[in-house]
Amino acid sequence: MSVVDMSLWEPRTELGRMVKEGKIRTIDEVFANNYIIKEPEIVDILVPGLKQELLNVNIVQRQTHAGERSLFQAVVAVGNEDGYVGVGIGKARQVRQAIEKAVREAKLNLIPVRRGCGSWKCSCDEPHSVPFVVKGKSGSVEVTLIPAPKGVGLVAGDVAKAVLRLAGVKDVWTHTRGDTRTTLNFALAVYNALRNTYYFKI
C-alpha cells in the first residue's frame, strides 16, 4: 500500500494534523475518540501493512448533457487482516483511475471489527470468528454472519470471503438473501454486518 512522505504531506484536517504531529499514534485512538477519517494518508500512517483486493470492475453508463458516457466502476476492499476493513467504489474513464479512487474511498471507509469466539461449539476464546450473530444489508442483499467453531473456515461466496479475510475473520457461516451477483451490494452488506459487530449495543 501507499507510503506517506511525512515531509511532503500537508494535512487538511485537525485529525490529520494530530497524526502528523504524533499526538495520535494508533488507529484505535481514532475510533475511541469518534474521529472521522477524511484523509487516506491517516490510514496509510496508522495502519501499516494494509492490504487491498480488487473485487470487481465493470462498465457503467453515465448520462451527460452530450449523451451517455461509459465509465469504469471498480469495487475494492482494504484491510489489515487484524480487525480493520474498508470497502470503496470508484468511477473513472480509465480502469487504473477507477481502482485508485476505490482504494482511496475504501481507506476513508475503514472501520474496526469486533471479533470473538461466539460459537457454542467452540470455547477457545480466540478472536477467529464474530462474537455473535450479526446482519448487514445493502440494496436487495442481506447477509447474516453466524459464529463458527475454529477450523470451519469462511463458508461464504468469493466476495464475502475477500472482505472477511481482510477483516481478520477466519471462521464464519453466512446466510444471504437477495441478488448476491451484484458485487457492490454483496460487499457492502458484508461490510455493514462487520460494522455492526462494533456498533451493536449489547
From Swiss-Prot:
Descriptive protein name: Small ribosomal subunit protein uS5
Keyword Ribonucleoprotein listed: yes
GO cellular component: cytosolic small ribosomal subunit
Species classification: Archaea, Thermoproteota, Thermoprotei, Thermoproteales, Thermoproteaceae
GO molecular function (one): rRNA binding
Domain S5 DRBM: start-end pairs: 50-113
Swiss-Prot/TrEMBL keywords: Ribonucleoprotein, Ribosomal protein, RNA-binding, rRNA-binding
Role summary: With S4 and S12 plays an important role in translational accuracy.
Keyword presence, Lyase: no
Subunit record text: Part of the 30S ribosomal subunit. Contacts protein S4.
Domain comment in the entry: The N-terminal domain interacts with the head of the 30S subunit; the C-terminal domain interacts with the body and contacts protein S4. The interaction surface between S4 and S5 is involved in control of translational fidelity.
Biological processes annotated in GO: translation
Family classification: Belongs to the universal ribosomal protein uS5 family.
Transmembrane segments: none
Cross-referenced HAMAP family: Ribosomal_uS5_A
InterPro entries, per the entry: Ribosomal_Su5_D2-typ_SF, Ribosomal_uS5, Ribosomal_uS5_arc, Ribosomal_uS5_C, Ribosomal_uS5_euk/arc, Ribosomal_uS5_N, Ribosomal_uS5_N_CS, Ribsml_uS5_D2-typ_fold_subgr
